[in-house]
Amino acid sequence: MKPSTPLRAVAILMAVGDIGHTSGVLRTIPRSLAEGGLLAPLQNFHIVMMGTSRTHWDFYVGFGLAVTFQFLTVAGLAWLTANLADTEPQRAKPFIWLMLAAQSAGLVIGYVYFFAAPLVMTLLTMILLVWSLVQLGMIGSPASGTREVRDGRSATGLDAA
């Protein structure tokens, strides 16, 4: 299996998560009178921030849409990192670790503030990222030592003697 496979799966998973997240953010019709009673104050209570009047609802929608674009950014980053993993695995490593760190933080946040679906998506994403590191021989494999790359330098960046 190519090292890019789990990273492409991460990209697809993030895109699917983005669709779910966006559909939740854009849903503005209350499902019940009680929910409508909760949303009305959020939509009507104004706060002046730096000279601009905003409602709590504005913040809810704005932050939700910002997260939507962050999902897409991570999906794109995972796809581009997959390309890199096949051609220059050592250069892909920091991007994979960065995504894994971000997903770890997301797992904690999801556990504290959200529900099962984001937790499951985050855990699957983390498993795929770890799998990509294993495929690249960067964790859990004796192949994680120094390897020669095309330009004659070792994978550690030090010139071979």
Please give the residue ranges for each predicted region:
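Juxtamembrane membrane-water interface segments that cap and precede transmembrane helices
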Residues: 44-60
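Short, intrinsically disordered terminal tails adjacent to the first/last structured region
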Residues: 142-161
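Mid-chain, well-packed structural core segment of small domains
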Residues: 62-99
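Alpha-helical transmembrane segments and their membrane-interface exit regions
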Residues: 124-136
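Juxtamembrane non-transmembrane "cap" segments at the membrane-aqueous interface
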Residues: 30-42, 88
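N-terminal signal-anchor transmembrane alpha helix
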Residues: 7-32
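Membrane-interface capping segments at transmembrane-helix boundaries
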Residues: 83-84, 134-148
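Hydrophobic alpha-helical transmembrane segments of integral membrane proteins
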Residues: 87-125
